Amino acid sequence: MSRGRGVPMMDLKRSYDVEDRVVSVSIPSIIEADEADLWPLPEIDTKKSKFPCCIVWTPLPVVSWLAPFIGHIGLCREDGVILDFAGSNFINVDDFAFGPPARYLQLDRTKCCLPPNMGGHTCKYGFKHTDFGTARTWDNALSSSTRSFEHKTYNIFTCNCHSFVANCLNRLCYGGSMEWNMVNVAILLMIKGKWINGSSVVRSFLPCAVVTSLGVVLVGWPFLIGLSSFSLLLFAWFIIATYCFKNIIT
């Protein structure tokens, strides 16, 4: 009877040790590779309207005169070019609608989940993120959202520029969240956004101050009550529609 050739115990132990070392370094290696993919961003150039990886905001004509917290926003590529959903089936590229940005907030790319495959998620959502649509890079997320919104109808109350930015942030799973919507995007920018300069502040609030003053002088205090009611109704609509009737809001 011939004996089968066995594998020496020393070789088995050595192979297990090698496998353990491979497993122990594989995850950090992936993370380091992902961080290496995030090349340095160019500097923000307000004069040329280049805001790398920023959310940008500008006041809307007439609407912002009555409710200055409402404005038009866009999201910028890594090279600083602004993309914004400005009308039905239309995404502006490097031509921000309604004037130059007045406020901006630069986002941190390291807070994005950019999985190379199903097993590469750094967020808690995994399959849900994949099903919604993931991105390998920041610009890839913007390109995917652009293709999606090129087939959507613009509506200031249900599907607007904030919806486009929220869609991009959900593809990026920014901050570990896929719950971005037009309300929390607006609040994020309102709380953490930076004014570009003093003239941006004036441009954003002076028309509202003038309209309010003229209204009080010509109509009286009822105008102020009506203006406050208008702002409150707008705010209530976006809150209720976003969190209570999710099928209405894009």
Swiss-Prot record:
Disruption phenotype: Enhanced ethylene sensitivity. One of its GO terms (cellular component) is endoplasmic reticulum. InterPro entries: TMEM222/RTE1 (IPR008496). It holds the Pfam family RTE1. It comes from the Eukaryota. Induction: By ethylene. It is found in: Endoplasmic reticulum membrane; Golgi apparatus membrane. Keywords: Endoplasmic reticulum, Golgi apparatus, Membrane, Transmembrane, Transmembrane helix. Disulfide bonds: none annotated. Strongly expressed in 1-4-day-old seedlings in the apical hook, cotyledons, root vascular tissue, root tip and root hairs, with little or no expression in the hypocotyl. In light-grown seedlings, expression could also be seen in the apex and young leaves, and disappeared from the cotyledons by 10 days. In mature plants, expressed in floral buds, the style of mature flowers, stems and the rachis. The keyword Acetylation does not apply. The chain crosses the membrane at residues 55-75, 200-220, 221-241. It is a multi-pass membrane protein. GO terms for biological process: negative regulation of ethylene-activated signaling pathway; response to ethylene. Interacts with ETR1 through a region corresponding to its ethylene-binding domain. Acts at an early step in the ethylene signaling pathway. Positively regulates ETR1, leading to the negative regulation of ethylene responses. This is Protein REVERSION-TO-ETHYLENE SENSITIVITY1. The gene is RTE1.
